Every structure is written in C-alpha cells, then in structure tokens.
Amino acid sequence: IGMSPNVRKGRTYDDLDYDYLSKTLDISAISFHKAIQVARRKDAINDWGSIVALSYIAAQRTLYGYNDMADAKALLESIARSFGYIYGREKHVRINTVSQSPTPTTAGSGVLGLGDLMEFAENMSPLGNASAEDCADYVLTLFSDLTRKVTMQNLYHDGGFSSMGMSRRAMKTYEKGLRFDDVHQNQYPFGDGEK
C-alpha cells in the first residue's frame, strides 16, 4: 500500500503539510511494520517464509516530483532490513523490498511527470521497463525455495535502469532537444525559455 496526501493535493516537497506527511509514512511504510509485528506475535509465518514489499529507486536517489513518497520508501526499506534481522534470526523468515520500474498505478498517477519518467526510464534501461506482470513473476521467486538465503535486500527489477548513467537512446533524445534549443535560442533572449 502506498499513498501520499501531499502528492494528491499537489503539495511540493519544500511545502509539505506535516499532518499529510505523517499519514504518508503511516500508510506507505509504518503499516508494513505493523503487519510484520502482528504476524510475528501471532506466529503467522512458517519457518523460511518470505515477506516482500514494493519500493522504488527514489528511496535512494532524488527523483523530482516523487515528493514525500521517497521518504516513505526509504523508511519501508529500513523496516525490511531491521525486521529482516530479527525475524531471520528467530524463524529464518526473509524480508525484502523490490524496486520496480516506473509503473502506472493508482498511487503513482499523482506523481508529477510520471509519463515522462516512464519514457525516460524506458530509454535508459538496457532491457526496457519491467511491466507490472514482470514484477509479479519476479516477486514469486522471492517466495520460492530458490531464494532461501536472500533477505534484508532491496532488489532492483527495473531493466537495468538503476545501474545506468546515460544510454545511447536517452542521449539521442537530449541531442534532439539541444538542436531544437540551438535553432530557437533567439526566441528566448533572457534565459532558457522556462517560464
């Protein structure tokens, strides 16, 4: 579950409503802690079981417009590590997070520039963006015995986006933009054309 009232209300990161931020953290990260805590107290997960949450690269890198959801995802990943140690030592329960490619979701629909981000990630990723279905298939492996020794990790499922600096496809897009700027530079005598 992930949701930010600040994003939904169009609040920028430098103008957060702190009550909304508290709700963002509670819904998008602390709820994960609560669920694991209850499962542990009730002994609801078998030995060598697995818990997986979805994160996003904005937990570690600045992505303009992702807003306070980046803070929530960073907290989510920290919870996975901290509880991963405790639950792992007790019952060998594995806890991981998966950072997925930008994917159109209800929660993501409020993120400023999501369509542009998806296009950028597609151009940057050697394998292209991973679909929601691809992500579901990947997460299934984390519930299998094939990943019995994988825990406390944030695992990237993003077509290679997280390891890229610049791709040829993305550079070509920038070159087109730069050529456009060169041709039209006289239209904006006082700057770069941003209003």
Segments (PLM) and residue ranges:
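Phosphate-coordinating loops and pocket residues in cytosolic domains that bind phosphorylated ligands
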Residues: D15, D26, G110, N123, ...
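Generic structural signal for alpha-helix termini and adjacent loop/cap motifs
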Residues: V38, K42, S144-R148, M166
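Catalytic loop of short-chain dehydrogenase/reductase
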Residues: M3-E90, S99-P104, G128, F161
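Short, flexible, mixed-charge acidic loops at enzyme active sites
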Residues: G10-Y13, G110-G115, R168-E175
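C-terminal helical subdomain
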Residues: I30, T97, G115-V150, L155-G159, ...
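Short beta-loop-alpha junction of Rossmann-like oxidoreductase domains
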Residues: E90, S101-G113, M166
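Non-catalytic terminal and boundary segments that flank Rossmann-like NAD(P)-dependent oxidoreductase
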Residues: N6-V7, D19, R168-K195
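Short, small/polar-rich loop/turn modules that mediate ligand/substrate recognition or access, typified
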Residues: W48, H92-R94, V150-M152
